[in-house]
C-alpha cells in the first residue's frame, strides 16, 4: 500500500473526507505518513458502476503501492503477508467514517472540484490557441474561440463560487444535525432531516 493509507473517492466527496480526516483521533500507526484522500474513482474499481448509476462512492485505495503489482489476487496474498497494524487501521478508519456519514442530514457533496477541472481544461484550450502550429490553422477563428473561452471561464468562476456557497450551507445543516444528535435532541434532529430531503434529492440528481 505504499507509505500511507488512502481513501479514493469521487471528486464530490473530497472536501468532506478531508474534513473527516482532520478531525480524527489517533488511530493505529500502520504507515509512516498520514492518511490521504485521492480522486477520482477508477474505472476498473467495483464502485465505478455505483458512481455512474448516481451513487457517490469511495473505496480503500491500494493502487499507490507495490501490493497491487506483487500480491493482489495472487498466491502471495496469504497469512504471511497479513499485517495486524494495517488491518486495525483500516477497520478503525472506515468504521469511524461510517459513523461520520451516519451523522449527516444531507449527503455532503461538494461540486467545486468538478468545476475546477472544467476551468483547468479551458486554460489548456486557451494555451493551445496560442501555439504557433495551431494559430495558423485557426486563422481569424482564433479570436472568436478565445472570446468563447473567456466567456466560459467567467461562467465557471461564478459556478465555482456558487458550489462553495452551497457546500457551506450543506456543512451548516450537518453541523447542526450532529450537534442535535449529540445533545439528545432527537425530535429536532428528525425535523431537520425531513426538512433537507428535497435538498438531498437535488444534490443526488446533480451528481448523476
Label each residue range with its predicted role.
Residues 1-71, 80-83, 87, 136-196:
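Metal-dependent peptidase/peptidase-like ectodomains
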Residues 17-20, 118, 125:
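Generic structural signal of hydrophobic/aromatic residues within well-ordered alpha-helices
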Residues 22, 26, 52, 95-106, ...:
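Sec-exported extracytoplasmic/periplasmic mature domains
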Residues 37-47, 110-121:
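A glycine-rich phosphate-binding loop feature that marks nucleotide/adenosyl-phosphate handling sites
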Residues 67-119:
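His/Asp/Glu-rich mid-to-C-terminal helical/loop segments that flank catalytic regions of hydrolases
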Residues 121-141:
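Surface beta-strand/loop "capping" patches
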Residues 201-208:
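Long mid-to-C-terminal assembly/interaction modules of large eukaryotic proteins
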Amino acid at each position: 500500500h505504499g507509505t500511507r493509507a488512502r481513501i479514493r473517492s469521487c471528486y464530490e466527496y473530497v472536501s468532506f473526507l478531508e474534513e473527516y480526516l482532520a478531525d480524527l483521533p489517533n488511530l493505529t500507526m500502520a504507515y509512516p505518513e498520514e492518511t490521504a484522500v485521492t480522486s477520482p474513482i477508477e474505472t476498473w474499481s467495483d464502485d465505478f458502476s455505483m458512481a455512474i448509476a448516481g451513487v457517490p462512492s469511495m473505496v480503500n485505495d491500494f493502487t499507490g503501492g507495490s501490493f497491487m503489482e506483487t500480491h493482489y489476487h495472487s498466491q502471495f496474498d496469504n497469512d504471511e503477508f497479513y499485517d495486524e497494524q494495517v488491518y486495525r487501521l483500516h477497520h478503525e478508519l472506515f468504521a469511524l467514517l461510517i459513523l461520520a456519514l451516519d451523522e449527516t442530514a444531507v449527503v455532503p457533496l461538494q461540486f467545486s472540484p468538478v468545476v475546477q477541472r472544467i476551468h483547468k481544461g479551458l486554460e489548456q484550450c486557451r494555451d493551445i490557441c496560442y501555439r504557433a502550429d495551431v494559430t495558423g490553422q485557426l486563422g481569424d477563428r482564433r479570436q472568436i474561440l478565445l472570446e468563447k473561452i473567456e466567456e466560459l471561464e467567467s461562467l465557471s468562476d461564478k459556478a465555482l463560487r456558487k458550489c462553495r456557497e452551497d457546500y457551506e450551507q450543506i456543512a451548516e445543516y450537518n453541523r447542526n444535525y450532529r450537534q442535535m444528535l449529540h445533545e439528545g435532541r432527537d425530535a429536532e434532529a428528525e425535523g431537520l432531516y425531513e426538512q433537507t430531503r428535497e435538498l438531498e434529492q437535488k444534490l443526488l440528481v446533480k451528481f448523476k
